[in-house]
Amino acid sequence: MASWTQPIETGDIPESGTSFDAIVVGGGPGGSSAAGYLAMAGKRVLLIEKGVWPRDKVCGDAVGGKSLSHVKALGVKETLEQTPHFRVNGILFSSPNGKEVRVPLPEEDVARLEAGYSLPREQFDHLLFDRVQHLVRENGGSVLQLSLIHI
């Protein structure tokens, strides 16, 4: 069974009164990335996600461009390379009347594996969230799943 179909264990609920340098609400790519960078900077983070991993979300299922530098910086690229994926080497635009325009990505980016990847959102989110929850917990933070915030 693929690892991204298995639940992610995120540890215990922090004790009442525990203080954090930052609280990040939302464990999707944006929230996970923010929590990961804060943890790598030595901050004590509380990451709160309303769902439970794994979960799927409607998406274009591609990671590329400037986001690849973050995938690499957060330590996810190597793991992504070891899971099923497609490499993106261009973009195809099509219209309802059947006309198509193909735009190749720069050959040097494709050759360096920096052009992009296509993989299910569930798989990418799982890889990122799992990596970040380790970073957060290793730096004294906590991660909560199935938690709603009411303000």
Give the residues covered by each predicted segment.
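Extreme N-terminal leader/targeting segments of oxidoreductases
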Residues: M1-A22, Y37-A41
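Glycine-rich Rossmann-fold phosphate-binding loop(s) that bind the pyrophosphate
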Residues: G26-G28
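Glycine-rich FAD pyrophosphate-binding loop
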Residues: A39-C59
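N-terminal FAD cofactor-binding segment of flavoenzymes
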Residues: V58-P96
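A conserved beta-strand/loop element that lines the FAD pocket in flavoprotein oxidoreductases
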Residues: H134-S147
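Conserved small/polar residues in nucleotide/adenosyl-binding loops
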Residues: I149-I151
